[in-house]
């Protein structure tokens, strides 16, 4: 039954993106005029490029604790991705035939970042900078007409010169047809994912299109309810089609998390998005045993899996359908 529930949800999401083709066509034909038209329609936004003063004021208003957290994340992400840098290969055989394999950076990349996710920008722009990409364009929508201070700080820290305040399918269309970047990366809702699928071939995209974010959490009686609820809320704020699932053999954990999540929603500025996402795509699953938990996770195939259990070994070597596993 679980796979049927998930399939129905995905089908409903696909039906919502039928207007993407029209948006792409209009932007390709009319340029910024069409971009502004759709921004006004969907976001009440009529300003698609921020001024230097706006960026300065946004960064100036940023909490020092947030700056410290971003700086910490930047250094850690940079250190990790520097380890991924590959070397060129050169081979010469006994007849002096030369074969060379060279790694060259793309000339330009467009990074789509949902309204309030500075971490997504960090995790996309840092590898691009390390690879040697010279031109990076950021597409990041405004929220209620305002820039996101944290994202503007990351953009400045990483040396991004081109920023468009555009979201949804119109942002992908702009990156592909107006900014004309070589490749588009970054997470987004179903409209963004569908737009990236349709422009692929005219512009590069990730090998696996980054659609709505999703997390599945395995918890037991010793798990921290606050940590579980915060993780679910963090994924749900990505968009209304994000999926958050909690699996446990302990009914009390499921009940406590449900109540705790409802209470902490009041503290979030974007509680409307989180609440709608959880109501549409949240799921609490009671499992009778470990095998049922493992089976459920392998059916769900989550982007992110968190094993918040005392004994992780009984799960991690039997789960093969998960993008990343946090222990």
Task: Describe every region a protein language model picked out.
Residues 1, 162-167, 284-289:
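Short acidic-hydrophobic, aromatic-tinged amphipathic segments that line or gate anion-handling sites
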Residues 1-107:
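N-terminal Rossmann-like NAD(P)+-binding subdomain of aldehyde/semialdehyde dehydrogenases
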Residues 91-153:
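Conserved small-residue-rich beta-alpha loop and adjacent elements
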Residues 131-146, 220-269:
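Glycine-rich phosphate/diphosphate-binding loop of Rossmann-like nucleotide-binding domains
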Residues 159-243:
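Conserved NAD(P)+-binding/catalytic subdomain of aldehyde/semialdehyde dehydrogenases
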Residues 208-219, 235-258, 274-285, 302-310:
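Short loop-to-beta-strand entry elements in the cores of soluble alpha/beta enzymes
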Residues 290, 298-327:
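C-terminal core of ALDH-fold dehydrogenases
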